[in-house]
Design a protein with these regions (language model features):
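Nucleotide donor/acceptor-binding cores
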Residues: 1-4, 82, 254
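ATP/NTP phosphate-donor binding region
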Residues: 1-62, 74, 107, 308-310
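ATP/nucleoside-binding phosphotransfer catalytic cores, i.e., glycine-rich phosphate-binding loops
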Residues: 17, 180, 211, 221-310
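Catalytic core of DAGKc-family lipid kinases
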Residues: 30-31, 38-40, 77-190, 194
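Short Gly/Thr/Asp-enriched flexible loops that form oxyanion-binding sites at enzyme active sites
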Residues: 67-79
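Glycine-rich phosphate/pyrophosphate-binding beta-alpha loops
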Residues: 135, 193-206, 274
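Gly/Ser/Thr-rich active-site loops/lids in small-molecule metabolic enzymes
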Residues: 150-158, 208-228
Length: 310
């Protein structure tokens, strides 16, 4: 019998109920797995669990995007990497929606375990992995500054309230130099976004043509500071992808280096969590072929290589 460990965050979202874990366990067992559920108790616990457990055939993350980030982080610290999967139970669930999951945990388990294993690129910022997005500047502190109890009580509305507050505050520019695709550019930027996803902050089709296995990621550098320009840009994101919005400098690359002129006070946001690394220089690159079991639904549009990994 195959072995599976489910690492779940008991504080994620509204839908994860401890009294239903036995139902999820029985469902996973129907797919031929001997399964163990482990609940996280503190930030970083999921990473510790995955980095230290013995070999298993599958590790499932059951939580928000941040929980999946920790699972991936822990896996990259192992000598022998494991096959991972993600069942979304968070607030925004950008990764889960991108993968093709819905809102029902039971249905998502079925979609996952009847899916395919794909080799997926994972980005690293100063050797710290992020699954789908890292950002700095305007609006980028909202995900980690919004209190957890408000996220759980109000869901996505909690982020919108934080966004409204941030919108009304003064927009700061950061003096940075970045190197990308053989170019070296200096300027003042209000926010920067590095991603490998077609859904970010609840915006579907943030980019129209994204592949998760092409050894590239997308970069946006924004010079906007006026509120009217920010409103126009957000409006265009509803009808057009971010690569075609005026005032946003867009690149697709496999390597990026960003240097701040002065030490930034705020932290980067990686997959909705605060990046604890504080320095003036950040280097972003790819870690290739991390094995992820996911639903078949969106594989054809998310991956260049259509052959099964296993």
């Amino acid at each position: 019998m195959k072995t599976c460990v489910v690492v779940y965050n008991p504080n994620s979202g509204h839908t994860l109920k401890k009294n239903k874990i036995h139902i999820y366990k029985e469902l996973i067992e129907k797919y031929g797995y001997s399964v163990t559920f482990i609940g996280t108790e503190y930030k970083g616990h999921a990473k510790e669990i995955v980095s230290h457990i013995g070999y298993v055939d599958l590790v499932i993350s059951m939580g928000g995007d941040g929980t999946f980030n920790e699972i991936v982080f822990g896996n990259l610290q192992r000598k022998t990497r494991l096959i991972l999967a993600h069942i979304p139970v968070g607030t925004t669930n950008d990764v889960g929606v991108m993968f093709g999951y819905g809102k029902s945990i039971e249905k998502n388990i079925q979609l996952c375990l009847s899916g395919e294993v794909k080799g997926m690129d994972i980005c690293l910022i100063n050797k710290r992995p992020f699954v789908y997005v890292a950002g700095f500047g305007k609006f980028m502190t909202i995900p980690y500054d919004t209190p957890r109890n408000l996220k759980k009580k109000y869901g996505h509305l909690a982020y919108l309230l934080g966004g409204a507050k941030d919108f009304l505050s003064r927009t700061k520019n950061y003096d940075v130099t970045y190197e990308v695709n053989g170019e070296k550019i200096s300027g003042l930027y209000s926010f920067m976004l590095i991603s490998s996803a077609n859904r970010i902050a609840g915006f579907n089709n943030f980019y129209k043509d994204i592949k998760l296995d092409d050894d590239t990621f997308e970069v946006l550098m924004c010079t906007y500071t006026r509120k009217i320009d920010i409103i126009k840009a957000l409006g265009k994101l509803i009808t057009s992808d971010a690569a075609h919005v005026d005032g946003l400098e867009f690149y697709r690359t496999s390597h990026l280096k960003i240097t701040f002129k002065t030490h930034p006070k705020n932290a980067w946001c990686v997959d909705g969590e605060k990046l604890e690394i504080r320095t003036k220089t950040y280097e972003i690159k790819n870690e290739r072929n991390v094995q992820i079991l996911m639903p078949k639904k969106n594989i054809s549009k998310l991956f260049v290589h259509q052959d099964k990994e296993s």
